[in-house]
Amino acid sequence: MTTLNRRTFAHLSTMSMLTAASRKLFGSIEAPSIFSQGGEMRVQGQNYIWEYSQAEDTVRLRDSQKRIIVDGKLQPAVIVAPAHDASGRLCTPGKVSGCHAERDRVTIEYEKVNGGARVSVTWRFDEHGIWLEPVMYETPTAEDVVSLHYFSEVNEASHQPSLHSTYLVVPGISEGSSVSPIIRDYMHLNQSVWLGRGSFIPGLNQQWGLPLHYFCGFSIDSSAGLRNMYTKGRSEAFTCGLADLPSGDLFLNLYQGKCSPWIDYRSDLWKHVRGPGKLSLGATLLWSVAPDYYEAIATYYRSLREAGVIHVHQNSPRKTAVSLTPQFCTWGSQVDENKEQERLDEAFLNQTFQALKASGLKPGLFSIDDKWEGAYGNLEHSTTRLPHFEQFLDKLREEGYLVGLWAALMRCERPADIGLTEDNMLKRPDGTPYLAKNSGTTHYYILDFTQPAVAKVLSDLVRKFIRRYKPDLFKFDFGYELPAASIAAPQDKRWTGELLMWKGLDIVIKAMREENPDLVVMYYQLSPLFLDYFDLHSTDDLFLAAGEYDLEANRRIYFSSLFGPLGIPTYGSSGYDWASAPSIWFDSAAVGTIGSLNDFREDEQGEANTPEFVAKYNGIAKTLRPTNIFNIVPLGAIPEAPTFGAHAHSWARIEDGQLVLLAFRPPVPGDENLLASERIDPRFEDVVRSTVPVVVASRGRSSITRDGKLAIVPYGEDKITIRRELGERAKMISHYFGGTVTQDETLIQGGWLKVNAVARSAEGKPLEWIEVQIS
C-alpha cells in the first residue's frame, strides 16, 4: 500500500484510500475465474485462490501470495437416526460421484452417503466473496437428521473435524478472559462452542458476543524454518460466517487443532427434518479474505451489505442521541449491596440515586436492572418491593435523566398472570414444559412465541410496557436462555435453532418500536444478521474478568468497533471495580458511549468512588462523538498473540474521511512491546504528541487538525501538542471537578497547538477536560 503523507491523509477519505489500496493490491475488480482439469478445480479471485482436489476430496484456500490460509476435507458428515429407532445413529461416508463447474459456481456430488443417500455441495463465487450454499441431502430412507457437520473426516467408526488453519479466532468463545479467542492449533482445545445464540449447557460459559455467527483464522508457514514465520510466512486471514439463519443450533467443534462448524437439528427428538426426500441442510456461508482477521471480519460485514443481505442502521436524530448518552446502571451496586433480583427494593433505588448525585458523576441516562418486575414475564413492577416505581421514573425525568430498563422478555414465571398456560411454554421431548432457573432462587418457563396466541399476548405486553413506563433505552438480556434443540423446542418446528431467536425478536422489538420508534435496544451480540433489532452494542457482562476488566473490555471493543460502519455504536460499560473504569472509558471514547456499574460506597475490591475517578468519567463524556456511523482504526495489535492479540493500544475514529478522535496511549519507555504492529500508524503519526495517554476529539464535523472546537482529556499532567492546519489563536478552558474553570490563550505556531494540561486546580480538584476554541 502506498504510504500516505500527513497532508494527503487529511484530504483523502477512508473509502477512497481503501479503494486505492484494493486496486493497488488486486487490480481492477473482475469476476473470479474458474479452471477445471482432471478432477482439479481452481478459482482465481481478486485476493484468493480456491482449490479443490477430487482425488483427495480436499478444499484449500490460499491468499494472493499463494500461502495456505485454511484447508480441509470437503464432504460433510450427516448424522441420522432411523425413523423406527430414535436412539440409533448412522453416519457413513459416501464417494465423490461428480464434480462440475458452471459460470460462477462449482458443485461436488457424493453418493452412497449413509448407505443410499446423495449429497451435493455448491460453492459460488462473485465480487462479494465466496459463498458455500446449503447442503442438499437426498435420501430414500425414513430417517431423521440429528446433525450436520461441515468439513469432516468421516470413516465407518467416527467423524472428526478436518478444517485446519494454524490459528483460529473465535470472539465470544468464553465469557471470561481466561480462554483467549485466539487459539493456536497446538493447543488442542477439544471443545464444542456456540457460534449461535448460546444456552446453558455443559461446556464453556459463553454470553457476550453471542450470537456470533462467524469464526476466523489464518496460517503460518514454518516449512523453511522459523525465520520470518510471522511476517512473510503468515498468511492473510479468512472469516467464515452465516449469510442466512439455519433451523438448527450453530456450533464450532474444535478437536486436536482442527475445527468443524456444525448444526444440531435433533430431529430424532422432534421429527421435523425427516426423510425420505430431498432436504436442504445448513445455511449459506460467506467466506471473506483480507490481510488480517480484523479486516476479514470487516470484509464479511461489508460483503453482506453490498450483497443486500444487511443494511446500514439508519437512526433518527433522537435515537442516535439516546444511544450515545453516557449511562449509569444499578447492577453493580445491586450485586455489591446484595440487592439483586427479588432483593431489589425502593429504598435501594432512592439511596443509589442520591449517592449518584452526591458523587458528582454526570451520566445522562439512569438504567434499572434485574429485578424491577414483580414476576418475570409480566412486565409490571413489583408493587410490594417498589410501590412508588413509576413516581421514581418520573423523578428521574424531572431531573433531566433518560430512563433505561432491563428485562428478559421471554421468561414467564406465572403463565396464568398473563392469560396463558403451561401448554404455551417451550416443551421438552417428553411433552413437559421446560423450566429454567436463574442465579437466584427463581424458576421460570420460556414462552413459546411461535404459537400465534402467545405472540399476540407477548406483543400486547411489550406495547403496554412501553406505553406505561416509557423507557428511552431497553436493555435486552435473554438469548443465552433459549434452550438448545437437544433440550426443548417450540410447537412450530419451522422456528427451531437460530431462527427461534429471530422469531422472538421480530415479535417483541417490532411491537416496541411501533409504540416508540426512537426506543434504543441494547444487546451484546456480534452477528450482523440481527442488526435490524438492536441499536447499541454492549460489552456486558465482564464479571468473569475480575482484576482485568479493562483488558477484557478492550478486547470486546476491538471486535465490536467493526459495527461502526454499519451504524451500531458500543456502550463501554465498566466492570465491577473503580480502578479499571478509567481505562475502559478511555477505550470506549472512540466507539460510542460510556457507562458505570460502580457502587458509590465500596466495590468488590473495597474501593469507593473518588473525585479522580468521577473526573475521568465526566471528561470522557465530553469527547463523545454525536454520530452512529464511523470507522475505527485500532492501533498496536499483535494478531497472533493469545494475550496481546485482539487488543488495541490506541484508537483512531474516522468520519467521512476525517480523523475526528484519537485516543492515544504513548509508548512507555522500557515497557514498549516492539512486536505491536503499527503502534503509531503513519496516517496518524505526529497528529498528537504527548507523554501521557490522552483523548483528543473534534466537537464539530471536521478533523482534529481543522475543527474550530476540540475536547481534550489527558490522563496525567503534560503539555499536549496537536498538529493544526487551520487557526491562529486558541482559547483553552480547563474544567475541573466541582465546577472550577480556568482559562488561557495561546498562538498556534508552525502548525502546532500546544496545550498545557494542569492536573489539579489551585484548590486541588482533578481536571475533567480541556475545552479548546480556535479562531
Protein language model features and the residues they cover:
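Aromatic- and carboxylate-enriched substrate-binding clefts and catalytic-loop regions
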Residues: 173, 363-579
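C-terminal beta-strand-rich structural cap/linker in extracellular carbohydrate-active enzymes
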Residues: 711-723, 748-775
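Active-site-proximal substrate-binding groove within the catalytic cores of carbohydrate-active enzymes
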Residues: 272, 276-288, 500, 504-721, ...
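C-terminal segment of N-terminal export signals and the immediately downstream linker at the start
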Residues: 21-42
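Carbohydrate-recognition beta-sandwich/jelly-roll modules
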Residues: 43-364, 473
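Conserved, mostly hydrophobic/aromatic
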Residues: 328, 396, 661
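Solvent-exposed beta-strand/loop surfaces of large extracellular or lumenal domains
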Residues: 732-757
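N-terminal secretory signal peptides and thylakoid transit peptides that target proteins
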Residues: 1-16
